[in-house]
Design a protein with these regions (language model features):
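Short, small-residue-biased leader/transition segments that mark boundaries at the very start
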Residues: 3-10
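Hydrophobic alpha-helical segments of integral membrane proteins
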Residues: 7, 30, 34-49, 59-63, ...
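Membrane-interfacial loop-to-helix junctions in multi-pass transporters
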Residues: 11-14, 42-56, 84-91, 111, ...
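Helix-loop-helix junctions within the multi-pass membrane cores of secondary transporters/permeases
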Residues: 77-153
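Transmembrane alpha-helical segments and their short flanking loops
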Residues: 79, 133-214
Length: 214
C-alpha cells in the first residue's frame, strides 16, 4: 500500500513539474495580452461613450483584481501628463467603496462569528484602498456581496462620468487621496456625491440580496 501511495505521489509531482511551467508559460502571456486589449478598449470607450464606459469599467474592477488583470496605470499616467487629469483611476476608488458597502451589509445579516468580524474589519479597510481581503475572504466565496459591489460600482462609475469627476494626481484609490480631486471648481464636491453613491449602492443592493442568517 505504501509503495502504491508513493507511486501516486511521484506521478502527481512529475505531473505538476511538467504542467506548472506549461501553464505559467501560457497563462502569463495570455494575461498580458488580455490586459493590453482591455486597456486599449476601455481607453477608446471612455473617449466615445463616457457613462457607459464608467459603468462597465467600474463594474468589473473587482473581477480584474480577483484575476490579477493589471496595466491600467499606463493610460492613467498618460492622461495625467497629456490632459492634466484622469478619469480612469477614480473608478478604483468608487469600486473600493462599493465593495466596502456590500461586505458590511452582508456582515449585518450574519450572526456573530469570526467571519462576520472579518467582514467588518475588511469592509472598513476597503475605504483605505485595500480590497483584496474583503474580495477573497468574503465577496468571492459568498458571491452576492461580489455581485452587489459590481452593481454599486457600475452605478457610481456612470454617475462619475456624467458629472465629470477626475483626479489631478496619481495616488492610492482610497480616502487618504481625496485631496488629489481638489481644483478651483466643484470637482471635489462631485467626488463626495459619487463616493456616497458608490458606498450606499453597494450597501443597499447587498442588504437586499442577502437574507438574514437564522
Amino acid at each position: 500500500a505504501s509503495c502504491l501511495v508513493g507511486s501516486e505521489m511521484c506521478i502527481r509531482d512529475r505531473s505538476f513539474l511538467i504542467s506548472a511551467p506549461l501553464f505559467l508559460g501560457f497563462a502569463a502571456p495570455l494575461g498580458n495580452w488580455v490586459a493590453k486589449g482591455m486597456t486599449s478598449g476601455f481607453a477608446w470607450l471612455f473617449t466615445h461613450a463616457g457613462p457607459f464606459a464608467g459603468a462597465l469599467f467600474c463594474g468589473i474592477i473587482p473581477l480584474t483584481i480577483i484575476f490579477g488583470i493589471k496595466g491600467w496605470s499606463a493610460v492613467e499616467l498618460q492622461n495625467l501628463e497629456v490632459l492634466g487629469h484622469d478619469y480612469m483611476l477614480p473608478n478604483f476608488f468608487y469600486s473600493n467603496l462599493a465593495v466596502s458597502g456590500a461586505v458590511l451589509a452582508w456582515a449585518l445579516k450574519q450572526k456573530p462569528s469570526e467571519q462576520r468580524s472579518a467582514a467588518i474589519s475588511t469592509g472598513l479597510v476597503c475605504i483605505l484602498g485595500i480590497t483584496e481581503p474583503a474580495l477573497y475572504g468574503i465577496a468571492l466565496p459568498e458571491k452576492k456581496p461580489l455581485y452587489a459591489a459590481m452593481a454599486g460600482g457600475a452605478i457610481a462609475g456612470a454617475s462619475a462620468m456624467l458629472m465629470g469627476v477626475v483626479t489631478y494626481a496619481f495616488s492610492m484609490p482610497g480616502i487618504t487621496s481625496i485631496a488629489t480631486y481638489v481644483d478651483g471648481g466643484n470637482n471635489f464636491f462631485k467626488l463626495l456625491i459619487v463616493m456616497a453613491i458608490a458606498w450606499i449602492s453597494g450597501f443597499v443592493i447587498s442588504f437586499v440580496m442577502n437574507k438574514k442568517e437564522q
